[in-house]
UniProtKB/Swiss-Prot annotation:
Gene3D superfamilies named in the record: Nucleoside phosphorylase domain
Name by which UniProt lists this protein: 5'-methylthioadenosine/S-adenosylhomocysteine nucleosidase
Entry's EC annotation: 3.2.2.9
SUPFAM superfamilies, per database record: Purine and uridine phosphorylases
Function recorded in the entry: Catalyzes the irreversible cleavage of the glycosidic bond in both 5'-methylthioadenosine (MTA) and S-adenosylhomocysteine (SAH/AdoHcy) to adenine and the corresponding thioribose, 5'-methylthioribose and S-ribosylhomocysteine, respectively. Also cleaves 5'-deoxyadenosine, a toxic by-product of radical S-adenosylmethionine (SAM) enzymes, into 5-deoxyribose and adenine.
Superkingdom: Bacteria
One cellular component (GO) term of this entry: cytosol
GO biological process terms on file: L-methionine salvage from methylthioadenosine; L-methionine salvage from S-adenosylmethionine; nucleoside catabolic process
CDD domains named among the record's database cross-references: MTAN
PANTHER family per record: 5'-METHYLTHIOADENOSINE/S-ADENOSYLHOMOCYSTEINE NUCLEOSIDASE, 5'-METHYLTHIOADENOSINE_S-ADENOSYLHOMOCYSTEINE NUCLEOSIDASE
One Pfam family it belongs to: PNP_UDP_1
Family membership: Belongs to the PNP/UDP phosphorylase family. MtnN subfamily.
Organism from which the protein derives: Photobacterium profundum (strain SS9)
Amino acid sequence: MKIGIIGAMEQEVTILKEQLTDCETHHKAGCIFYTGNLNGADVVLLQSGIGKVAAAVGTAVLLEAFQPDAVLNTGSAGGFDSSLTLGDVVISTEVRYHDADVTAFGYEIGQMAQQPAAFISDEKLILTAEQALASMADMHAVRGLICTGDAFVCTPEKQAFIRDNFPTVIAVEMEAAAIAQACHQFNVPFVVVRAISDVADKESPMSFEEFLPLAAQSSSVMVAKMVEILNQ
């Protein structure tokens, strides 16, 4: 089984990259791909860049050039669920855009034209994430809706808009729905497993800078364990 792992930023992929054996580096379309072996599995680790377009371009290249059997999206996210604290993990059951609006043409808020309203995570990968979680002491996770947009959510107005339109949202970030849409179009299963680096409020930028390393550590540990389980 070949597994694709996607993180937007260098800090979000470094821990996993350092665990790869027989690592080779490839540069395509402005993205960095690391191929190698992780916990016995063939892995392609993508550093896509930040935002929806960068993520979609990188994911499309990953899927076309390397043809993974599944995609795991790792990294950081802003917490919306009240039970989440810094370093906790979020596991996607579905992913939606929070900044898409073609409702004038009869689509749901957040639904891109000619696309499903939500991109549904693969149930086997969700169960694998929960199995990985069960093997780790003192790690808390919430599964649910993750919303994506090309904005760092740090104002009460933006937070209220997202809560009003997506009341079940547990976390927000800037790449997952674009990754999910690419996987949907290539018919490749995906799941998002990220860790909380900040809470979506006015203190978010300061929190993000301080706690990104903690989020990267938590999400990387989860993903590495998932790879081990998937390879069994």
